[in-house]
Design a protein with these regions (language model features):
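Short, well-ordered alpha-helical microsegments
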Residues: 51-53, 142-145
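Glycine-rich phosphate-binding loop signature in dinucleotide/nucleotide-binding domains
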Residues: 37-38, 123-131
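Short, acidic/turn-prone active-site loops that include or flank metal/cofactor-
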Residues: 68-73, 160-164
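A polyampholytic, Gly/Pro-enriched intrinsically disordered region
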Residues: 83-98, 176-192
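Beta-strand elements within well-structured catalytic alpha/beta cores of enzymes
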Residues: 44-45, 127, 131-140, 144
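Active-site-proximal alpha-helix that buttresses catalytic centers in soluble enzyme cores
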Residues: 1-69, 86-96, 100, 104-117, ...
Length: 192
């Protein structure tokens, strides 16, 4: 089902399921991204196929740590039978509804924020130990995680949280706010 077709709520629910099960397209990752993370000993990913496939494409020889901790913030299709929209419009409606408390059998916004609070220390520890932490995950959860990292003394130095393939966001510890324990150098945490 394409993103440009007008669909109802049931078709959007199927679209979500299909997207969650999908892998990645054959396009290789951008060379500048591959070079940015080349020295990483491991890559963190969600347990979804597209995240794992992307992680392997980026760092084929690094240790892969796949965990539901980094899974995308969930979407559910609101039952609006009279409405037909394109999938991206449905995604906006579903996300707004989710923020408003619509969570039929899925993780709530508050639970996603809590998961981000659990995920941030994993990346911070990796960055402090190895000088880099690489996460290949999903746009909306990455944005929630980014807010959590900023609250913990990290700052975004490049990129923006966008819903695009191979989107890259780089964080460094903001030494003016929270110097690294026993270190003065910044540590980068690319969040895919």
């Amino acid at each position: 089902m394409g993103r440009s077709r007008w669909i109802g709520h049931a078709a959007f629910a199927r679209f979500i399921d299909d997207y969650q099960a999908a892998g990645i397209e054959a396009d290789p990752p951008p060379q500048e991204l591959v070079e940015l993370i080349a020295d990483a000993p491991r890559v963190f990913a969600s347990e979804l196929k597209r995240s794992i496939d992307s992680a392997r494409a980026l760092l084929p020889y690094a240790e892969l740590v796949s965990t539901p901790l980094f899974t995308e913030a969930p979407l559910a299709s609101p039952r609006l039978p009279a409405l037909r929209m394109k999938a991206p419009a449905w995604a906006v409606v579903a996300r707004v509804a989710w923020h408003g408390g619509f969570k039929p059998g899925i993780e709530s916004y508050g639970q996603s924020k809590q998961r981000a609070r659990q995920a941030a220390p994993v990346l911070i520890e990796e960055a402090e130990q190895n000088g880099i932490a690489v996460l290949v995950a999903h746009g909306y959860f990455n944005a929630i995680l980014g807010r959590t990292l900023r609250r913990r003394g990290w700052r975004r130095v490049s990129g923006a949280h966008r819903a695009r393939f191979w989107n890259t966001v780089v964080y460094e510890r903001d030494t003016a706010i929270a110097p690294p324990p026993g270190r003065s150098a910044t540590r980068r945490v690319p969040a895919g």
